[in-house]
Each structure stands twice: as C-alpha cells, then as structure tokens.
C-alpha cells in the first residue's frame, strides 16, 4: 500500500513537471527548466502536440532556455515537428546565427533530403547564416520535394544580396524545378527586378564573348 501511494505521488509529480516544463519553455524561464532537468525530467520529452522542447524554445523564441537545453548532454538536436522542420531549420528562418552555430557544433544536420536549412536562410535573406551553412558544407543546389533550390527561393522571396551570394558561391542558375522553372523564372514571376538583374548580370558575365573574325589581308 505504501509503495502504491509513493508511485501515485510520483506520477502526479511527473504530470505536474510535464506541464511546468513546457510552460517554462514558453516563458523562457531558464531557472525552472534547469530545476526540472536536475530532478531528472527527460530533456527529449515531447509536448501534447508532439513537439520537442528545443523546437518550442526556438519557435517562441525563448533564447535562454534554448541555450540551456543545448547544453544538456542527452539533447536530441535533430528532432522534427509535424512539418518536418528541425531546430536548425527554425534557427535558419529566424536568422539566429549564433544558435545555428551551436546546433551545428552539437551535430545538427546541415544537409538532409527535401527542404534544407539553406533553403530557409536563403528565403529570408539571412546572409551571415547562409555563409555559416555553406562553410559547414551545406549543398548549395539542394533540391526540395518539388526540386526547388536555395537560389530559386532567394530569387523569389529573399534579397538580391542573397542571390548574389549563392551565385558567387557556385549555385547553378540553369537548374529547373519540377515545374520547369529556373531561378530567373522565379524572380520574374515574383516581379523581383533586383533579383532578375542580378541573375541576368551573372549569366552575361559568364557567357563566352564571340571573337570578331580578323579581316582578310
């Protein structure tokens, strides 16, 4: 009977800890999260929406808690939300370069099938983060499920600077997605004149110039 009471009390305590943990993450309450982890709460526990605490901390954002979670030994740095996004992908959306670097240092996947962090950073024109990903061997022409590349995303949604960065780093402007569209087509479709001019200038500069034939003597 005593054992049953102890176990029941433990289950109620853990239920309370479960709620407290995710509320504390949302509130960026690093003190409470730290206390719960020291009591043995599993850092990789998912919330009621099957979302990992690290994903929640980055999405909120709750930067202090995110750093605390990253510092734990058993943290999973590659969990996915229901949309298939990882912590590094969310950090790439928000342009959180310092956090992205820590994620990479802990083993976060820079390359993965489908949408990749570089797609996200390029979409939002986060140049510093784009450079970080490329320095860690992000595949520059990564293909999304519809075969769109980071350059295409930058051309349609990002900035001319993001387009220029990718082109100068070796992105292929001639690639086409599943709809047969190139990065230039993306820029035109979105009425992005700055991206159109950037891609056109790059293509023109790399096109071999015709050599004028010498006049017969």
Where are these regions (language model features)?
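Bacterial N-terminal signal peptides
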Residues: 1-9
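Intrinsically disordered, low-complexity regulatory segments in ankyrin-centric signaling systems
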Residues: 9-41, 48-51, 67, 71, ...
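Ankyrin-repeat-protein effector appendages
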Residues: 13-20, 136, 169, 178-181, ...
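Ankyrin-repeat boundary/"N-cap" motif
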Residues: 16-21, 46-52, 80-86, 112-117, ...
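Ankyrin repeat A-helix N-terminal signature
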Residues: 23-28, 56-62, 90-96, 120-126, ...
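Ankyrin repeat structural motif
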Residues: 29-37, 62-71, 96-104, 126-134, ...
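Alpha-helical adaptor scaffolds
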Residues: 111, 115-135
């Amino acid at each position: 009977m005593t054992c049953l009471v102890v176990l029941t009390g433990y289950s109620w305590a853990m239920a309370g800890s479960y709620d407290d943990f995710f509320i504390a993450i949302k509130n960026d309450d690093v003190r409470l999260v730290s206390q719960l982890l020291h009591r043995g709460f599993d850092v990789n526990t998912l919330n009621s929406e099957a979302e990992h605490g690290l994903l929640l901390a980055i999405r909120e954002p709750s930067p202090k808690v995110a750093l605390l979670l990253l510092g734990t030994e058993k943290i999973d740095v590659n969990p996915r939300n229901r949309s298939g996004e990882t912590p590094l992908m969310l950090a790439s959306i928000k342009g959180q370069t310092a956090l992205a670097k820590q994620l990479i240092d802990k083993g976060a996947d820079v390359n993965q099938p489908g949408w990749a962090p570089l797609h996200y950073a390029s979409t939002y024109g986060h140049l510093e983060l784009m450079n970080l990903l490329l320095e860690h061997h992000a595949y520059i022409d990564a293909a999304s499920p519809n075969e769109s590349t980071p350059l295409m995303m930058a051309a349609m949604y990002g900035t001319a600077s993001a387009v220029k960065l990718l082109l100068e780093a070796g992105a292929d402007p001639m690639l086409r997605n599943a709809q047969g569209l190139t990065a230039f087509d993306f820029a035109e479709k979105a009425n992005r004149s700055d991206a159109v001019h950037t891609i056109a200038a790059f293509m023109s500069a790399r096109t071999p110039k015709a050599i004028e034939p010498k006049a017969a003597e």
